[in-house]
């Protein structure tokens, strides 16, 4: 089995996983194109957990692609938490990403960073949390973990 870091990567342990309850799963995927987001959406659709929440951040250079990416998760993700990729001057801000998610009829909220986003959405309810939209965002998550 081949595993590519940052592509449908299940986080089983570490600081980020420790912030969550035991029944919450954490997945990272650096999908930053329409095609790669379709693959992630297909994978998430197969998972038997109904409550799926996304943490989304992307670069400004992918702005046109961002709307197409979000569209692929309609009916899959119940909520989107938008974040600006830390220490990345070319990152879209969370406000604009939230507006984009709202235009696609997602429940959407902004967050300052990944840790803040996880605090906002972690509950005792069984769920899958997927951090996606940029390899930079996934890299940031991995460095924090």
Name these PLM-found stretches.
Residues 134:
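Active-site-proximal loop/hinge segments that shape catalytic or ion-binding/gating pockets
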Residues 1-79:
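Nucleotide phosphate-binding/pyrophosphate-handling subdomain across enzymes
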Residues 39-41, 67-68, 94-95, 142-145:
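Short amphipathic alpha-helical segments
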Residues 21-27, 70-128:
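C-terminal helical cap/extension that packs against the catalytic core
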Residues 137-139:
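Short, active-site-adjacent cap segments at secondary-structure transitions
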């Amino acid at each position: 089995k081949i595993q590519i870091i940052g592509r449908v990567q299940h986080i089983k342990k570490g600081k980020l996983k420790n912030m969550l309850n035991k029944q919450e799963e954490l997945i990272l995927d650096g999908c930053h194109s329409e095609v790669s987001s379709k693959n992630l959406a297909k994978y998430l659709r197969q998972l038997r957990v109904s409550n799926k929440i996304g943490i989304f951040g992307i670069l400004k250079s992918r702005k046109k692609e961002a709307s197409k990416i979000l569209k692929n998760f309609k009916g899959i993700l119940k909520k989107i938490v938008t974040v600006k990729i830390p220490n990345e001057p070319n990152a879209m801000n969370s406000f604009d990403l939230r507006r984009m998610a709202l235009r696609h009829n997602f429940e959407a909220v902004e967050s300052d960073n990944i840790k803040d986003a996880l605090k906002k959405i972690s509950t005792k309810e069984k769920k899958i949390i997927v951090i996606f939209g940029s390899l930079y965002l996934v890299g940031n998550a991995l460095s924090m973990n």
